[in-house]
Amino acid sequence: MTVAELAKQLRISINRLLDVISEAGIVIHDVENDVLSPEQKVAIAGHMKQRKKQSATEKNAAKSDNKSDKNSKTGAKKTTNRRKTDARKSQSSEKKISPRELAQQLAEKKRLEQGNAQRENEEREYQEALAAEEKRQQQEEARKAKREQKEAEAIRAEEERLQMEAALQAQMQEQERIRQEKEAEEAKLNAEKELRKQQEREKRLAQEKAELERKRQEAIRDVELRESYEEEAETRFHIQSKDRNFGSKNDRSGKRAVKNGDDERSGERRNNARNNTRRRNNDNKKGKFEKPVAPISREVRIPETITVGDLAQKMSVKASELIKTMMKLGSMVTINQLLDQETAALIADEMGHRYVLLKENELEEQVMAQASENKMDVVVRAPVVTIMGHVDHGKTSLLDYIRHTRVVSGEAGGITQHIGAYRVTTERGVITFLDTPGHAAFTAMRARGANVTDIVVLVVAADDGVMPQTKEAIQHAKAANVPLIVAVNKMDKPEADPERVKSELSQEGVISEEWGGEHLFAYVSAKSGMGIDDLLEKILIQAEMLELTAPSSGVGKGVVVESRLDRGRGSVATVLVQSGVMKKGNVMLAGMEYGRIRAMLDEKGKELEEAGPSTPVEILGLSGTPNAGDDVIIVENERKAREIANFRQGKFKEIRIARQQKTKLENLFNNADGEISKVSLMIKADVQGSVEALADSLRELSTDEVAVNIIATGIGGITESDVQLALASSATIIAFNVRAEANAKKLIEEEGGDLRYYSIIYQAIDDVKAAMQGLLSPEIREEIIGLAEVRDVFRSSKFGAVAGCIVEDGLLKRHNPIRVLRNNVVIYEGELESLRRFKDDVNEVRAGTECGLGVKNYNDVRVGDQIECYERVEIERKL
């Protein structure tokens, strides 16, 4: 505390306090800044008390002086009264006091009175200050005591809380230990059960395999036996033919001998010599051609599909030999069965022949060769950028902000269902964007997007990090060998953690330039637009480094990004032009479909007359809906396009039939036991990519017990013929973003068909999965509900051996199955014949209760045996 603060607290002037401090022997240099120590404050207080006492003493002395003066004046007055006359005379004779002296006396008196009053005020102020200080100290001590009390209470409460937490933690640990022991026991039981099932399954498979091998060996023996019979019959036929020829010649020789009787002996000798020569020649020929010295290796020209009989003829072997070889390879075939090129080449190589694979698409190769010669007028083209990433990480929202349109609201559930292609003009240049879906079911569509792109922008949410589809997108980008730019989205959220994203991506091999890698990172927000300009700049920088070029004229080439069937416009294909120019009126070949371009539209629906490289367009006029990913090329005329399309359709049909026949017998053996249930489905969707994604996802749900059988797929609305096919096959129709026609709806209502509409793919997957779970046979689990110990055995003429028991645990039920255990070994399984308590028949007996029971068809119950009662519970199985 400084001097000024102390003076203010004591309510005295600073000068007076300085006088007191100097009288106390304390040196002060700065009134405002010098701080008084506690010892100095005590010394000042003591000096002020001493000064107060001194002042009081002086005051008392002054009062006594005044009193004596007053007494003397009274005596003088009396004397004056007695001597009035003399006094008057003396007063008149005395010298008078001047006014100046009187004023001085009055001033001195007033000064003394003021000094006394000031001292009294100072003393009073000092006492008040001391009282205030004492009161403040008392309040401070009270607050300190109260604070210490609160701290003690807080410490005590914290100790109680810690004790409660420790007790709760111990209780939780005990519960966790009990739960783990229970789970371990259940896991052990499940493992034993699974082991038994596995052993039974392996045993069944071994039996089936042995049976199949036995049938195969029997078939091989039948073929060999048939061949031996054929060879024996052929040999017998040759011998009989020779014998007939030999007999007829001898007859003719005999006749000639009779006619020429003079030369009979010479004729017989000539005939015998001639016959011996023919016999030797026949023997030599037979030995030379029946058993070749070395196998003959021939060059076999194998087309894309060939029957078993035609392949055997080309190799100059019997069809039975070829069938036998395929049986040894594990395939059961017939002589008229179609083989694909790969299988035929494998068989030819196995039988020691050389093969040449033929291509029957010379016209197609000629068209492709003409298109590849288009190398003139090369210009810089816009980069094709594919937006990839996990579902709900903001891919479409990011592209939506760049395009300044609302697309997400139009997607079902805010999830992109198929690839969208957009051409965006920015201040820095033109960029073509492909927006791919992030749901797990659309793997094939993301792979197509990576294959037709120049740059992949991987969108990762800053608050979610790396997810399964993020990893898959990285793999697609690496497989396509395209550069990867990472856009860390949702940076406007408080929980955004870009460092975590960089760390997780580095584990997948995507390392940012900040960490010494080669991948560009942009931190953006699709909601606020933060970092969008930086992302576009990095895309264009990467495009400049790639030096993207394409022919600006000549034959147009591209790829089908997506296709659908529009009710009013027919087949509509989204095509990305990669080189050359596509014009309205050109003849186009897209996969197995062809047609003349009737109209070309951009992403905004504006009609175009022509489209150059890196331009996405919607094309109308094809004969059908091509598959997503099919190559597109402009052909010279419609006749040539039709020939190539028909050739491709025929070959696709042959290959499909060959593959179906290849697995037909295997499926027959697998389904012979009739244990596999099937869920038959028909899939109709709006675009080809959704059909593929939905079909692939549903096929992956198949198990050993329940299989998904997709009888047909297609795009467009559901027609009456679709419903008839579904009804004939007892199939459920999955309608994805399409609707049924009026006739089809009426037929479904009349016949009771099953039609389901979906707009989000995982809802369809979940419903089919639930239907498949309903076809799974439930798991039967045995739960022990009671245990009793046999204390005595009684013999009854009516019931045989009756066991007197006491229920140790749970309860015994009369109608539940039981086991008889002796030394913890099951010696009998059956059911109770009777259950009594005293003389009354009861349905159940609980723990701690005695009872008598009889085991049906079992009389060897002994004292010490245990009766275990259990029940079988059906548990619904999950896929």
UniProtKB/Swiss-Prot annotation:
Domain tr-type G: 380-549
Region spans: G4: 489-492
Chain spans, region G1: 389-396
Region (Disordered): 45-216, 228-293
Record-listed GTP binding positions: 389-396, 435-439, 489-492
Main location per the UniProt record: cytoplasm
Cross-referenced InterPro entries: EF-G-like_DII, EFTu-like_2, IF2_II, IF2_N, P-loop_NTPase, Small_GTP-bd, T_Tr_GTP-bd_dom, TF_IF2_bacterial-like
Record keywords: Cytoplasm, GTP-binding, Initiation factor, Nucleotide-binding, Protein biosynthesis
PANTHER family registered for this protein in UniProt: TR-TYPE G DOMAIN-CONTAINING PROTEIN, TRANSLATION INITIATION FACTOR IF-2-RELATED
Protein name: Translation initiation factor IF-2
Lineage: Bacteria, Pseudomonadati, Pseudomonadota, Gammaproteobacteria, Cardiobacteriales
